[in-house]
Amino acid sequence: MAVPSLWPWGACLPVIFLSLGFGLDTVEVCPSLDIRSEVAELRQLENCSVVEGHLQILLMFTATGEDFRGLSFPRLTQVTDYLLLFRVYGLESLRDLFPNLAVIRGTRLFLGYALVIFEMPHLRDVALPALGAVLRGAVRVEKNQELCHLSTIDWGLLQPAPGANHIVGNKLGEECADVCPGVLGAAGEPCAKTTFSGHTDYRCWTSSHCQRVCPCPHGMACTARGECCHTECLGGCSQPEDPRACVACRHLYFQGACLWACPPGTYQYESWRCVTAERCASLHSVPGRASTFGIHQGSCLAQCPSGFTRNSSSIFCHKCEGLCPKECKVGTKTIDSIQAAQDLVGCTHVEGSLILNLRQGYNLEPQLQHSLGLVETITGFLKIKHSFALVSLGFFKNLKLIRGDAMVDGNYTLYVLDNQNLQQLGSWVAAGLTIPVGKIYFAFNPRLCLEHIYRLEEVTGTRGRQNKAEINPRTNGDRAACQTRTLRFVSNVTEADRILLRWERYEPLEARDLLSFIVYYKESPFQNATEHVGPDACGTQSWNLLDVELPLSRTQEPGVTLASLKPWTQYAVFVRAITLTTEEDSPHQGAQSPIVYLRTLPAAPTVPQDVISTSNSSSHLLVRWKPPTQRNGNLTYYLVLWQRLAEDGDLYLNDYCHRGLRLPTSNNDPRFDGEDGDPEAEMESDCCPCQHPPPGQVLPPLEAQEASFQKKFENFLHNAITIPISPWKVTSINKSPQRDSGRHRRAAGPLRLGGNSSDFEIQEDKVPRERAVLSGLRHFTEYRIDIHACNHAAHTVGCSAATFVFARTMPHREADGIPGKVAWEASSKNSVLLRWLEPPDPNGLILKYEIKYRRLGEEATVLCVSRLRYAKFGGVHLALLPPGNYSARVRATSLAGNGSWTDSVAFYILGPEEEDAGGLHVLLTATPVGLTLLIVLAALGFFYGKKRNRTLYASVNPEYFSASDMYVPDEWEVPREQISIIRELGQGSFGMVYEGLARGLEAGEESTPVALKTVNELASPRECIEFLKEASVMKAFKCHHVVRLLGVVSQGQPTLVIMELMTRGDLKSHLRSLRPEAENNPGLPQPALGEMIQMAGEIADGMAYLAANKFVHRDLAARNCMVSQDFTVKIGDFGMTRDVYETDYYRKGGKGLLPVRWMAPESLKDGIFTTHSDVWSFGVVLWEIVTLAEQPYQGLSNEQVLKFVMDGGVLEELEGCPLQLQELMSRCWQPNPRLRPSFTHILDSIQEELRPSFRLLSFYYSPECRGARGSLPTTDAEPDSSPTPRDCSPQNGGPGH
């Protein structure tokens, strides 16, 4: 067998290691890229060598495989953050797209993941053949229904800690043809083998691309020839031990070389490269703005850290003396959230103006103080408006100067307007706030006392600058009701996400008193809203506010557009005029509209949630889902579309006669067993949303991460898919669907599949509830099912984007049956061609056929025929058959398993004499007809007369039967009337085996349960005699661990041999029944180490007894050991009770059947069978016990096993096998027979671990054994010297047999 190379990837990967030099003049560094919608957008990657940031490729619904053909970016070798692929249609592999992508650094991660491949409907393999390292972060590969070759990737070679990877929901491994190069007939040299997650296997990306496994220490990279790269290289190199020939750098890169640290005068940037101070100074966080980059502790940072600052004359960060001055140039910055305020953390000097507009929130002062508490100077103005969440301005605890370089409306340096809950100005008075120029303005602050404002005037030095209208006593600190006028709305226009409002013009007595309007609006399911605009009981603002400036023309009606609204939602709206009164004694004039209720128009719903499926028959699928999170209308029905998927034709390329067949399943989703939740139930609560989780209630980190990841992708859907295509107009993929190409352009694509799926019609149905039953489907076939949610406006807005699931129907029981009869024709000497028709409508694909054929009077042989081999001839050639009469039958194996056997077809192979007679017959046909008839009649008369005289029985001797051939009844004879048959147990090598009762067989027992062996009714006298001679061998055996002969019934028909009843059958069947997936599992646990050693001891004891009696077994295997009711294992009765395990035997050169997988090399080479060769077989039996009766040398044909063992090969070491058993097997498989232990020596090594009962019952502890020690056969005996009388048994044949 070929030995895999440690670095086979160099021979089979089309990797072009570019000699880029890594200088900035040759390496193109690209920023983060978000490529979506159009395949042409991928051209942005054309010259990129490194993506400094993330690379996202997503939402290409109209792309096809042709669009990606020829598209390749071989220059790209590194992504510094993460790589994400999401819903890119038509892309089948990343192999050509990124052939040289070697490193994903994971500097910044996507929810903890460095590589994300999510819902890629046509991706068949990942295939990043050059990928050598994912430095940080996990891998998430999920919901890719065609994605295979995941089981052959060793993620441990790429990641330091692959345990957090999340790889679920992809194509079932059983349905994939995951074969690596050089394995099971695949082209190329074998890939390297590694162990990952407890599984040792060949490692590859595809069937033609191995995964790189470098033979270098400490995870070093290597060249294509397997030579070790420099220690600073990562992902490979073009020359060994050269830091300038690396594909990527392990640490840092500068001017074409990979380095451990940046050289003097350069600084680390983005964790992977070095830049000069000049280069760092030229970088910009925000294009168009002055650079804020600084150098600190050898790194080029986007901003100096806390406690450090930089000045205009130096790029280096310096430690502050005292309070760290930090100048922040902001222009005019609006702070409308805590997040926006965090941009000013650490700022002491704000160059620009601040506008505070904090409308929602609870207890914000501590958080605002963290962000704004160090501000001492504002060079422009400070405007605080509509900040209902503010109670105090104390968070500006260090504010000393508002300089007024810029002013509100050219007049006001401090402008405080409409803050309904503002009560305190904080420490401004104590701190001595100075406003050197401009006025202050306070209006509509009903809770702010005037005395605070007047005191501020004195401290800031602004008293006398402003008039009474600018600090109006009627709108500050005064909760008294004002005289107001009613405003009327004159028009409103609603859309799905906006409302356009207009109201009548309002003119107060003094036109200059009207400042602006404020529109208040909020969701209001019921028409019970009040005009209270302060914070609600939870501390948050219930109304949304929108400032409306006065129209430029006095004749124009004011209006506004409320945007970003929810579809099909009722809103409460009112408008209020903001006025002031210039005359102190005049009444307050104001205006306000009544509350009106408006509903937005419907829109397409979001996608249905949590779709699951199951199959309850071969023609039905059941699908269930949950309603969409946003219905955007009255949900009226769901549109369900389904299409049959073509089976993967690549499965035909595998020879399943040699490769293990793992079948796809159609198991029910366990969630179907749960009770249905009420999809209409809505969460209702009269309480405020909690700011912190209740004590003791902690969301598990994994669940929290799962929920966060799912939410992130839902955001993708909502942000990128504006309105879905109207799928309800699609009836067949062969028709031309009429779709709106305008506003629906960027929607999620309709159901469209790759491969031959387009040959199958798309079907649809409308269902009113969250479930559907799909009927009339093809058996054992995979379907894609799309579910769209549709509301009452679907005829205008369309239905939702699709959520989809893949499901497979159950198999049809009779679909894999072969129609008609099997035909045959002679093709050449000793050869026939068997032909049959394929099943017309199988369960999925037909993968192989099995032919069971037998020569009359011999055991059956099973031949496996791959689908490709069948396709060449429409059948199979059976060659090198000995002359005789044969029968054969055939069955097919599909994706669903085995079909039924056909009826037997009879055929014959002519012998040499018959062929000569046939030639003579041809010659005689040329003679006159009369002569021909005369000769034929004479011959018939002659043979008829001979037949009447006597019947011939073939014998090797001239006499028909010698005295030694006859069976003579003795003391073992049991009268037939004492025997009664109860039931059939199975087929033995001579005939049927029954369970029965024998009366008077044992003293003190009225009846004894026994096993009864019979010969077939058509057996010849010779076969009956051989049957009785097999039984006679056991008359001399009396050992607890050898199955006992109890008697013989030789008088009359049928001949019976009475044996000890072993109720649990043979050891092979018993072990297989203990597998967890076994259908006949008796509910027993798998055997522990002590039980395995007990089985081994009992078998060794029985074999030690046979060896002491000079008996060589020749066919020791689990199938020939029997298990009693109390689980004692005994050596079987030497071929008589063996079940017909045809595949365990091999016919070598037309001779008898040989158990080659259990035979020692000397037996295979020279036909030598000794106790030593039995010890070899015992080692294989140990291997069977550990593996629960797997087939030895699985994956190799009998011919390959024959050559492998004769060339010195042995079975591989088992993963997780106890060391004691593994060492014992190794001793049994010594190439030199004399170095193998005897069975008594084997018992010596394990006697301490055997049960106490073993000492009482075993041969090993008997006086006979002690006397027999030293006289065991140790020389290589020729087969004919063995005392066994079974000279004609094919298992015992030596040379010449």
Swiss-Prot record:
Membrane topology: Single-pass type I membrane protein
Cystine bridges: C214-C222, C216-C228, C229-C237, C233-C246, C249-C258, C262-C274, C280-C300, C304-C317, C320-C324, C657-C864
EC number of this enzyme: 2.7.10.1
SUPFAM superfamilies associated with the record: Fibronectin type III, Growth factor receptor domain, L domain-like, Protein kinase-like (PK-like)
Segments of skewed composition (Polar residues): 1281-1297
PTM description: Autophosphorylated on tyrosine residues between pH 7.9 and pH 10.5.
Consequence of substituting G1065E: In a glioblastoma multiforme sample; somatic mutation
Highest taxon, organism lineage: Eukaryota
Region (Disordered): 666-687, 732-758, 1267-1297
Catalytic site: D1115 (proton acceptor)
Annotated residues for binding of ATP: L985, G986, Q987, G988, S989, F990, G991, M992, V993, K1013
Chain ranges of the Fibronectin type-III domain: 483-603, 607-707, 818-913
Biased composition (Acidic residues): 675-685
Listed GO MF terms: ATP binding; insulin receptor activity; insulin receptor substrate binding; phosphatidylinositol 3-kinase binding; transmembrane receptor protein tyrosine kinase activity
One GO CC term, this protein: plasma membrane
Function description: Receptor with tyrosine-protein kinase activity. Functions as a pH sensing receptor which is activated by increased extracellular pH. Activates an intracellular signaling pathway that involves IRS1 and AKT1/PKB.
Assembly and interaction partners: Probable tetramer of 2 alpha and 2 beta chains linked by disulfide bonds. The alpha chains contribute to the formation of the ligand-binding domain, while the beta chains carry the kinase domain.
PANTHER family: INSULIN RECEPTOR-RELATED PROTEIN, TYROSINE-PROTEIN KINASE RECEPTOR
Domain comment (free text): The extracellular domain is required for sensing alterations in external pH.
Protein name: Insulin receptor-related protein
Taxonomic lineage from the root: Eukaryota, Metazoa, Chordata, Craniata, Vertebrata
Gene: INSRR
